Amino acid sequence: MGKGDPNKPRGKMSSYAFFVQTCREEHKKKHPDSSVNFAEFSKKCSERWKTMSAKEKSKFEDLAKSDKARYDREMKNYVPPKGDKKGKKKDPNAPKRPPSAFFLFCSEHRPKIKSEHPGLSIGDTAKKLGEMWSEQSAKDKQPYEQKAAKLKEKYEKDIAAYRAKGKSEVGKKGPGRPTGSKKKNEPEDEEEEEEEEDDEDEEEEDEDEE
């Protein structure tokens, strides 16, 4: 989403994100030379956030509101580069990036949270999922990590085949067209098979993402 565009407004931050930022700054002041263990740090922040009163949280909620107003204001004036959307939508048949272990965990647990807390906002649902994930043991996370690793491996194979297919198609349009009539038929068969596989892969990944 416009990662390469330096003029794109910085994304808005939630109240919890401001709180985590404050925690990180406090940690840096207290331990300037020590590195942060992010899993441990996230868990401590989450536990601390849970015990805070509404009054203590209000400071961060005010920061989030003003940041949202800043973001909305900047987005109204923001014009994305013309080539930005074209670059994104140029390859609709390209294999989709595989979901992470955390994303798979969210897909599985989000419906349960929604049914238990129907009024919960998207941001609060995401925060709750983050807290749940940080509370999982390494053993509990393992099935999601294994599935994510398999999907990543599959994606790497698919993207390699997709790129190879793109190169072979460019080659066909090149000057060697009249002499390669026999060779032309062989890659086409392979490409048809690859296209079928790509379609199946996309369906599987769509199901996972849902």
Swiss-Prot record:
Span list, region Disordered: 51-102, 162-210
GO BP term (any one): positive regulation of innate immune response
Segments of this protein annotated with the region Required for chemotactic activity: 165-180
Keywords of the record: Acetylation, Chemotaxis, Chromosome, Cytoplasm, Disulfide bond, DNA recombination, DNA-binding, Immunity, Inflammatory response, Innate immunity, Nucleus, Oxidation, Phosphoprotein, Repeat, Secreted, Transcription, Transcription regulation
Subunit relationships: Interacts with POU2F2, POU2F1 and POU3F1. Component of the RAG complex composed of core components RAG1 and RAG2, and associated component HMGB1 or HMGB2. Component of the SET complex, composed of at least ANP32A, APEX1, HMGB2, NME1, SET and TREX1. Directly interacts with SET. Interacts with LEF1.
Physiological role: Multifunctional protein with various roles in different cellular compartments. May act in a redox sensitive manner. In the nucleus is an abundant chromatin-associated non-histone protein involved in transcription, chromatin remodeling and V(D)J recombination and probably other processes. Binds DNA with a preference to non-canonical DNA structures such as single-stranded DNA.
This protein's name: High mobility group protein B2
Gene that specifies this protein: Hmgb2
